[in-house]
A protein has these predicted regions:
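Short histidine
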Residues: 10-13, 19-20, 38, 42, ...
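N-terminal helix-turn-helix DNA-binding core of bacterial DNA-binding proteins
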Residues: 24-65
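Generic leucine side-chain signal with a strong bias for well-ordered alpha-helical environments
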Residues: 30, 40, 66, 70-73, ...
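Basic, amphipathic "hinge/linker" alpha-helix immediately C-terminal to the N-terminal HTH DNA-binding motif
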Residues: 34, 85-108
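Canonical helix-turn-helix DNA-binding module
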Residues: 52, 56-84, 88
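Amphipathic alpha-helical dimerization/coiled-coil segments
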Residues: 104-132
């Protein structure tokens, strides 16, 4: 702990000779999920939203932005797009295994936000569907 009560600074490793820009898995991950809308789309997917209009309504996101983010998530195998209705044709978006494995990251962001950014404490209660 830092004397001011904040977290202690971590000293950089000076003996590491790796090109961090090329080898950084954090940077590579942020290329996929690093913008506000993408994280919120993933949050809503974990909440059970599946269809374009559901995401649009919940997030109040411009249609073109939502279409772009969903397309990118599908291209990167974080979500899969499946037809769920034939007439008219409608699609749903579901998390892949890769997408599901983002769960701890979203939970960590929520916990960090609850701790450091929320004046009233935790606004969200997580309940596991199978365990209650």
């Amino acid at each position: 702990m830092h004397p001011t009560g904040g977290p202690a600074a971590v000293a950089p490793a000076h003996d590491v000779h790796v090109d961090l820009a090329a080898a950084c898995s954090i940077a590579a991950s942020l290329d996929i999920v690093g913008d506000r809308w993408t994280i919120l789309i993933l949050r809503d997917a974990f909440r059970g939203l599946r269809r374009f209009d559901e995401f649009r309504r919940d997030l109040d996101i411009p249609r073109a932005v939502l279409a772009d983010r969903l397309r990118r998530l599908v291209e990167r195998d974080v979500m899969v797009k499946r037809a769920c209705q034939e007439r008219p044709v409608r699609y749903e978006y579901r998390l892949t295994r890769m997408g599901i494995e983002l769960s701890p990251i979203l939970v960590a962001l929520m916990q960090w936000g609850d701790r450091w950014l929320s004046e009233d404490g935790a606004p969200t209660l997580l309940v596991h569907e199978a365990w209650g």
